């Protein structure tokens, strides 16, 4: 080939979709009438090749679920500390003000603590998943590398499905903290809810993730990888079972700090 351009392929973007969220991402209507397709790789191996990309994308979508959930929490926490309304049931907290911050109210605290615990636990999960992926690629011991790869595969549908399901719920809770303000565009909370909703759908719906987990990942090695994970949990519990319990007073002092 001399590098001369051939005839233009019959492919065109005919319009933009109008979506619920992620408006910064242009989703186009594509027209492929009479387009010529080129085979990439060996015949009948496309699905296998595609899943190399899909598995990476599913982890990225899980990170999206965590990221949007966390910024929604940070905004909700700031608002709950700043917005004053009513008095705490346990007694006046800020006598110099006409009302206490809504942070003192039980249901607001419940929502914020649910978001905080989810975000922190999920961040640890993401770190562990990244470690397994690194070990699968770089671990010198082939047995350990294979085990890390199996654990990463087992948790991929969990990272995608569970994290985005709960991330959406956390964003709804963050919006709820704002009350009526959360429903108004200028406060930004409704955008988090709209933007995170897609994470439960694309790169394989979360129902498909459940099928993948139960139908493929758990049964692929007759539960051997799940047993490895179970032993890891048991070892962790054994190593920390003698730790001094954290007092409720200590928890209350730190539970809603950013």
Regions found by a protein language model. Give the residues of each.
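Internal glycine-rich alpha/beta core junctions
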Residues: 1-242
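Acidic, proline/serine/threonine- and glycine-rich low-complexity intrinsically disordered segments
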Residues: 245-247
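Conserved small/polar residues in nucleotide/adenosyl-binding loops
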Residues: 249-256
């Amino acid at each position: 080939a001399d590098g001369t351009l051939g005839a233009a392929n019959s492919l065109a973007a005919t319009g933009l979709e109008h979506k619920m969220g992620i408006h910064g991402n242009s989703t186009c209507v594509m027209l492929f009438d009479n387009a010529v397709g080129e085979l990439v790789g060996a015949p009948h191996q496309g699905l296998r090749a595609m899943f190399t990309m899909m598995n990476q994308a599913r982890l990225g979508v899980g990170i999206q679920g965590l990221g949007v959930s966390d910024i929604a929490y940070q905004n909700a926490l700031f608002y709950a500390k700043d917005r004053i309304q009513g008095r705490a049931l346990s007694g006046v907290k800020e006598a110099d003000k006409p009302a206490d911050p809504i942070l003192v109210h039980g249901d607001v605290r419940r929502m914020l603590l649910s978001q905080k615990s989810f975000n922190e636990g999920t961040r640890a999960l993401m770190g562990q998943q990244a470690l397994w992926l690194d070990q699968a690629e770089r671990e010198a011991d082939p047995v350990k590398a294979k085990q890390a790869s199996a654990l990463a595969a087992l948790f991929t549908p969990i990272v995608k499905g569970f994290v985005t399901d709960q991330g959406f719920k956390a964003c709804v809770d963050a919006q709820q903290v704002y009350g009526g303000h959360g429903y108004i565009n200028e406060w930004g909370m409704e955008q988090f809810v709209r933007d995170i909703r897609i994470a439960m759908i694309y790169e394989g719906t979360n129902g498909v993730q459940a099928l993948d987990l139960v139908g493929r990942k758990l049964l692929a090695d007759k539960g051997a990888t799940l047993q490895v994970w179970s032993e890891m949990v048991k070892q962790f519990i054994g190593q920390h079972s003698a730790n001094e319990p954290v007092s409720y007073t200590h928890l209350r002092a730190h539970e809603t700090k950013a």
